[in-house]
């Protein structure tokens, strides 16, 4: 069969009407027969290993198990495509249709959709202005609701009545007398459906808006205002999507295609099946039992109990464990419901739809790149040659080094020295994207200029770690190569790490020293009285200090005197509120004054002009000052 690509802009998820659910599952065959309704809980016949008719794997409803072959075996060829078998009623088509054809279960009694009853917020309770517990009592047959108060002064429309209510004995006694003859009480999901269908959304929205406008003092009744706003928002959503509130009560259950809930035969004749099949089977069994009880006019208390059990079975199918006991399978393992399949990290959306495998991407552990600039990352040679292979092959052919792709790949596999030079040319001005999961904000994906490095770890500048919320204790990051020129331009202009210095959430700098960098700065500038090697030595400039440190004549933390004539330290000392203590004052034979303080030594002439100035510091602080000064000069 020809395959047609379907293009779409977005996926819209909203409430489905009973007619829409029936439309999903129901089909009219060429012979006029309507199929789609599942009435039997059976899956496959244990003798023939073929699907049971009208069961959860029915070939008439969902399509043939084998391509171009019907259930009974009368037709076994593509030649009969589209033919409906006279014996079994199966359409001759591809087995692939079992991945998208749906069925439905028609319920003997309406049930509440648990997402809208027990979800946060509870849509049903907000629309009906009731507590969730009250709605729950009605749904699970523990309380009544007044659907029509009639002429009674005791009752009001929508009031919840339980057997513990003080009015209940009187109402129960007089319910079928003339006094309360026109009073109508309801119980179960049918009663909630009736209340929801009686709602006039347009009128409700108008009333709420008038209340909100008239209530000018916003400080009073803040909680009441918030409830009204929440209700108005829900009503507006229903109006905008053209959905009706009573659709939150289900009368039809859609059954997903059988190939999405498969049953697989294992070695030894046993079968492994999806948990959904067990949950669907529970619903069908209880639904069929309720139908039989209704047919034989069973007592109301028995029918109500069966309706409650059906409600619980549907709850378990939609969201197992949301309410009541968790339905378990073999070895007390909770069965995976539809919600469990959809939600969470391993769910359908995050795992299969958003988390797809990507070409031209790699993944490795991150380590510190000491020599890197902020906008650079160290890319391992092995990873780079794989990611940029198409560009390398193109360059090899373009330069005439090889004639075809096969020869180029052979040259790459042989690790020819020319490949490294070609790769260096290719990655120049070609940014790569680095992503660290979880991608919580836009700074979790940034662009960097790759630098080829040895080893197998990706090297990263430590200043960009706060943006990625990364550290170097085994974190992994993914690399992606933007292929098109437009993608490369966008990566360079918008996503380069040096262009993302501020947090989009707060506006505060996000490129801040942290962890190892802070520890290193602290270690360079800290006092350490144990390291006394070269203590008290004099140096003419900072270069001499660093040479002496490299020659191990002084320790990193030894206090030394360094000549520093550039400017006076008085302003800095005042700003830092550092007290100067004059230890000694001498006048030499030339009349120059030598002042020795706790932080510096000054030599002044007769007029008080500073001739030389030595400050007390350490080799670590000199090194720190030099690095910071160099970085500032480079930025300027």
Curated annotation (Swiss-Prot):
Chain residues that bind Mg(2+): 471, 473, 475
EC number: 2.7.7.6
SMART domains on file: RPOLA_N (SM00663)
InterPro entries for this protein: DNA-dir_RpoC1_gamma, DNA-dir_RpoC_beta_prime, RNA_pol_asu, RNA_pol_N, RNA_pol_Rpb1_1, RNA_pol_Rpb1_3, RNA_pol_Rpb1_3_sf, RNA_pol_Rpb1_clamp_domain
Keywords for the protein's UniProt record, in alphabetical order: Cyanelle, DNA-directed RNA polymerase, Magnesium, Metal-binding, Nucleotidyltransferase, Plastid, Transcription, Transferase, Zinc
Names of the cofactor(s): Mg(2+); Zn(2+)
Free-text cofactor note: Binds 1 Mg(2+) ion per subunit. Binds 1 Zn(2+) ion per subunit.
GO molecular function terms noted in the UniProt entry: DNA binding; DNA-directed RNA polymerase activity; magnesium ion binding; zinc ion binding
Subcellular location: Plastid, Cyanelle
Record-level GO cellular component terms: cyanelle; DNA-directed RNA polymerase complex; mitochondrion
Residues annotated to bind Zn(2+): 70, 72, 85, 88
Domain of life, per lineage: Eukaryota
Reactions that this protein is recorded to catalyse: RNA(n) + a ribonucleoside 5'-triphosphate = RNA(n+1) + diphosphate
Main location: plastid
Biological-process GO terms, alphabetical: DNA-templated transcription
UniProt family annotation: Belongs to the RNA polymerase beta' chain family. RpoC1 subfamily.
Summary of the function given for this chain in its UniProt record: DNA-dependent RNA polymerase catalyzes the transcription of DNA into RNA using the four ribonucleoside triphosphates as substrates.
Designated name of the protein: DNA-directed RNA polymerase subunit beta'
Organism the protein comes from: Cyanophora paradoxa
């Amino acid at each position: 069969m020809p395959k047609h690509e379907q293009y779409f802009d977005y996926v819209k998820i909203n409430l489905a009407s009973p007619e829409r659910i029936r439309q999903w599952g129901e089909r009219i065959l060429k012979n006029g027969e309507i199929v789609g309704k599942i009435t039997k809980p059976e899956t496959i016949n244990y003798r023939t290993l073929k699907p049971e008719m009208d069961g959860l794997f029915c070939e008439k409803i969902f399509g043939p198990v084998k391509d171009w072959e019907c259930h009974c075996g009368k037709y076994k060829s593509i030649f009969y495509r589209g033919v409906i078998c006279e014996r079994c009623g199966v359409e001759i088509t591809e087995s692939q249709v079992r991945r998208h054809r749906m069925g439905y279960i028609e319920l003997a009694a309406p049930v509440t959709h648990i997402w809208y009853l027990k979800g946060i917020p509870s849509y049903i309770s907000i629309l009906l202005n009731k507590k969730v517990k009250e709605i729950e009592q009605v749904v699970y047959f523990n309380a009544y609701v007044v659907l029509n108060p009639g002429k009674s002064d005791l009752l009001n429309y929508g009031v919840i009545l339980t057997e513990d209510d003080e009015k209940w004995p009187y109402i129960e006694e007089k319910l079928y007398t003339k006094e309360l003859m026109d009073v109508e009480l309801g119980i179960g999901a049918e009663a909630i459906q009736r209340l929801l269908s009686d709602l006039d959304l347009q009128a409700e929205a108008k009333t709420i808006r008038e209340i909100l406008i008239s209530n000018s003092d916003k400080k009073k009744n803040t909680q009441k205002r918030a409830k009204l706003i929440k209700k108005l928002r829900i009503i507006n959503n229903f109006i905008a999507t053209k959905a009706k509130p009573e659709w939150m009560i289900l009368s039809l259950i859609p059954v997903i295609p059988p190939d999405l809930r498969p049953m697989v035969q294992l070695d030894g004749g046993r079968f492994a099946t999806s948990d959904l099949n067990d949950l669907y089977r529970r619903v069908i069994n209880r639904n069929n039992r309720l139908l039989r009880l209704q047919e034989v006019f069973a007592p109301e208390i028995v029918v109500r109990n069966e309706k409650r059990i059906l409600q619980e079975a549907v709850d378990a199918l939609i969201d197992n464990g949301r309410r009541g006991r968790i339905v378990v399978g073999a070895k007390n393992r909770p069965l995976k419901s539809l919600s469990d399949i959809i939600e969470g990290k391993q769910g359908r959306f995050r795992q299969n739809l958003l988390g797809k495998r990507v070409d031209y991407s790699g993944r490795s552990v991150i380590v510190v790149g000491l020599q890197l600039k902020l906008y650079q990352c160290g890319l391992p040679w092995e990873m780079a040659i794989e990611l940029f292979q198409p560009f390398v092959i193109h360059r090899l052919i373009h330069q005439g080094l090889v004639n075809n792709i096969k020869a180029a790949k052979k040259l790459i596999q042989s690790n020819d020295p020319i490949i490294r030079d070609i790769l260096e040319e290719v990655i120049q001005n070609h940014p790569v994207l680095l992503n660290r999961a979880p991608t919580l904000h836009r700074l979790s994906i940034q662009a960097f200029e790759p630098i080829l490095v040895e080893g197998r770890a990706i090297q990263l500048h430590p200043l960009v770690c706060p943006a990625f919320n990364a550290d170097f204790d085994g974190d992994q990051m993914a690399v992606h190569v933007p292929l098109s020129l437009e993608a490369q331009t966008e990566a360079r202009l918008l996503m380069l790490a040096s262009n993302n210095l501020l947090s989009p959430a707060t506006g505060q700098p996000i490129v801040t020293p942290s962890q190892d960098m802070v520890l290193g700065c602290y270690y360079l500038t800290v006092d350490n009285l144990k390291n006394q090697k070269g203590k008290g030595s004099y140096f003419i400039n900072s270069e001499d200090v660093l040479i002496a440190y490299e020659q191990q004549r002084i320790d990193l933390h030894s206090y030394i005197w360094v000549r520093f004539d550039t400017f006076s330290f008085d302003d800095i000392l005042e700003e830092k509120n550092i007290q100067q203590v004059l230890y000694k004052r001498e006048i030499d034979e030339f009349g120059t004054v030598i002042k020795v303080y706790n932080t510096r030594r000054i030599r002044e002439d007769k007029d008080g002009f500073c001739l030389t100035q030595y400050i007390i510091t350490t080799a670590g602080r000199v090194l720190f000052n030099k690095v910071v000064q160099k970085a500032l000069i480079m930025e300027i």
